[in-house]
Amino acid sequence: TIFSFLLRKIFKESKFISLENLIKLNALARPQYAYCAYYSALLAKKLSYDKISFIEFGVAKGNGLLYLENLAARIEKELNIKIEIYGFDTGEGLIHPDGYRDLPYFFEGGMYKMDIDKLQKRISKSKLIIGDVKHTVKNFFTDYKPAKIAAIFNDLDYYSSTINSFNLFNADVENFLPRVFCYFDDVVGSSEEMYSEFSGELLAINEFNNSNENSKFSLNTNLQHLDLNWKNQIYYLHHFKHSDYNVFIDPKEQIGINNSISLK
């Protein structure tokens, strides 16, 4: 509606409104980042974790990583939780596409090359992990000892790079939240991109689900009724065998539901 549009314009990125309300208004430059970052941190708080990590796969020029830093600062203040940020990138742009599954009709090697020195000077808390994700994820947990991974922002474009990034999940599930908030950039596109479940990030997601019994990506269902152009890019990674997966997290909401169904 026009009223909703005006509200978004008036309050966009406002420092005087809580981040949660800005997300509900869709009044943010990168609402999909804010949604995953904020609600993953809120889940962590409900599970009594005092520190979490965000990961961005495919940093490119670095605008998303810088935005994530700003989000983290607000979330740390609003929710009283510590946040670490890690950004994975080759530093040299996209690698050469490996067959049709990497969508060579739309992407080519060398695109989105990073100016590493320039970005290093701009970031404040993020750690850049430079190299082919096929190799850099292997020792990530031993080399960096990150706090539990709460949210992952995946913009690797290719099937091959995306499926290689999923090797991160070969680690113990206790390194993650029991349910990880995930954003996939290249699952909703244009008539030229023509993304499908037979290539790109969607194929990687399907293959992961087919080969893993105890961890599954699931497209969100809670945003589907909303008019959001990013709603089909939000997935949840369920780790069913996580020690905290079955922990009851929201008694206040259940109290409200119980009261609402009471006989009058």
Task: Annotate each predicted stretch with a short phrase.
Residues 34-50:
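Conserved alpha-helix/loop element of class I SAM-dependent methyltransferases that forms part
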Residues 10, 15-27, 47-264:
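S-adenosylmethionine/decaboxylated-SAM
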Residues 25-36:
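Conserved SAM-binding loop and adjacent beta-strand
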